[in-house]
Amino acid sequence: MAYDHKTIEKKWQKFWKKNETFKADLNKDQKKYYALDMFPYPSGQGLHVGHPEGYTATDVMSRMKRMQGFNVLHPMGWDAFGLPAEQYALKTGHNPKDFTNKNIDHFRDQIQSLGFSYDWDREVNTTDPKFYKWTQWIFEQLYKKGLAYESEIMVNWAPDFMGGTVVANEEVEDGKTKRGGYPVYRKPMRQWVLKITAYADRLIDDLDLVDWPESVKEMQRNWIGRSEGASVFFPVVGDEDTKIEVFTTRADTLFGASYVVLAPEQELVDQLTTPEHKAEVEKYKEEASRRSDLERTDLNKDKTGVFTGSYVINPVNGEKLPIWISDYVLASYGTGAVMAVPSGDQRDYDFATKFNLPIKPIIEGADISEGAFDGDGKHINSGFLDGLNIADAKQKMIDWLEEHDAGHKKVNYRLRDWIFSRQRYWGEPIPVIHWDDGTTSLVPEDELPLELPKTDNIEPSGTGESPLANVEDWVNVYDENGRHGLRETNTMPQWAGSSWYWLRYTDPHNDEEFASKEALDYWSPVDLYVGGAEHAVLHLLYARFWHKVLYDLGLVPTKEPFMKLVNQGMILGSNHEKMSKSKGNVVNPDDIVDQYGADTLRLYEMFMGPLEESVPWDEKGLHGANKWVQRVWRLLMDDNNHLRDRVSTFNDGKLTKVYNQTVKKVTEDYERMHFNTAISQLMVFVNEAYKVDDLPVEYMKGFVKMIAPIMPHMAEELWSQFGESDTITYQPWPTYDPKALVEDEVEMIVQVNGKVRAKIKMAKDTDRDEAQQLALANEHVKKFTDGKDIKKVIVVPNKIVNIVAK
């Protein structure tokens, strides 16, 4: 009979749940292994077939590690705050909490149907007050450490969108919201900010401590953007007490500076704009406020700008340089001011060409007739730097600046502090009170969690504040002395819960602390973290930042949270495009589980190709995987679903070599997460097993253990058919005998007069005389030696017989 996946999979899922098979308890006498998936956002669409790929990979590792004697922590939870739930609630009038919980229930059912070995007792949900109590508590530690502060930040403000709201850079196109096409303006708004820049160097340096893809490390380094250079001070003409500070990585080009550019929002713009240029500057500032940072810094964008009417003095040669404003300079980067060297920077070159500003050559032999030159060479027109290369000239100029109090060496970062507030309802409340006397205080720790109030009115306030500003009985507070204050109405971003959730899994029911020292010391760090490459920068950077803060506070034992990171590839539609509802190419795993079973889906997704590569969904491949599942079943089970008689204790040795080869290769490939090649070897073993009359039970048990991480339901059923009463989960992983891998036969090449005439199989280490006789007796060789005089025979044992015949 065929393998009945519906009955067998339900049977074993019920068994695992009833027996809490995958429950992880702290056991200091046992080595641990912590395998973690990036927890999902529980969307209304439910799982698609891309989710199980990463989940199956961590499950294979978890199941193998348990069998290798490790105490495995393998949890699952929900990153459940998010804008889609709020938008759905606004559209339908339903509460986002109810919508989210319904989605979580659906996700959980789908995940459980796939047989993953999660410890469900450790499930976390970022929207649960018992969880976000500790998100708020960590925020309070950041605040006490001076790492959380309020600041006026330029944001994208859409006054006509959703009643007036802030939108992200990615939601802006051509000065309008992508959804609805509402006008967007740049305006300063009070925001909470986390000082991630204080950890910039450590976030770069500690990448050396982890086993991550080099591409991800490089993306993080580039995002942080550490650059060494100098700050240069340019005194303003007519007001020498006012100086414009500029950061440059090329202090050696100071002699080539021909103008200075300020961002339109830079704090000195109004002060430096002369009356005759005021109208023009104000108009330009208003136009710039309609563009996002992404649009403004597009290298292909036509350069725009206006002159302020003021000048600065170049400290190195006393030249007057005009001060312009242009939107290609951002107030949020560096000091919001740049010294423009058109001969060495293409953006400056384009700007200078458009506005007819001087372009001064400073590198000998550089052709600047068509564009800027940023290569090395000897300096010219550069005073005391003439004749020096770039490296030497940089250092000499920095020395000069420091000696003349005109500047100093400086390290700058592309990384900006993390804007941590959102003008939304559906997020963690920030535990802060603003008192009428102008002071700010944290909600006392013993009053946490500060719960999100229930309200039917989650419409944007229209003022830029979050909808929480509308909940007056929640917002207004009084202390014991009658002092009035207002609660912070901004909420935390969705990144907050995911910046520490892996720590909560180690001790999820602790009401006294986010996790006990004992649990953290035992389970930390995460040994394997698997998720999509789209989180290569922000989530991983924020998580590392919070972890390092907690490390500095003595609350976690490791500098880094995730030791090994793997990014699984994307499962594309059969048309090689990304799966999406709009393209109609989404495959629902529920349908696959119903038709073929979870083991088939798991097998297929691990066999599609290397885990890190993106591959298209292929129904033929899925059908082929199911055929192999049935083939494995028939190998061991007869038509009455009983173990075949040829599975016995008799071992004639015919499978010994291939069995040991399979144990070795599958173990090594699983460890390297090369699941597709491990499955190929399992297929080789099954093919060989079908060729023999007797199936030694010890080999069959070992084989079933090896398929258990990928096909756990079938493996459990087959294990029970061997008469075993315990789950296969904790059975010892099979080992191989190195002696059985030794080749007992070799292929010898036979050459006659330098040309290969035959390849002969013979026993390994056959002596020279016998090898010579076998070679000369070979029928094909004799065609080239008959009637000839054998002058010489050279034998290289186990490799070659070389015959010289005349």
Swiss-Prot record:
State whether keyword Nucleotide-binding applies: yes
- The domain of life is Bacteria
Main location, first listed in the record: cytoplasm
Keyword terms, alphabetized: Aminoacyl-tRNA synthetase, ATP-binding, Cytoplasm, Ligase, Nucleotide-binding, Protein biosynthesis
* Molecular function via GO: aminoacyl-tRNA deacylase activity; ATP binding; leucine-tRNA ligase activity
Q: Which processes are annotated in GO (biological process)?
A: leucyl-tRNA aminoacylation
Q: What is its EC number?
A: 6.1.1.4
Q: Which residues does the annotation say bind ATP?
A: 581
What is the main EC category here?
A: ligase
Q: Where is this motif: 'HIGH' region?
A: 40-51
Renumbered to this chain, motif 'KMSKS' region spans 578-582
- Places the protein is found: Cytoplasm
Q: Which family does it belong to?
A: Belongs to the class-I aminoacyl-tRNA synthetase family.
Alphabetized NCBIfam families for the sequence: leuS_bact (TIGR00396)
Q: What is this protein called?
A: Leucine--tRNA ligase
The gene behind this protein is leuS
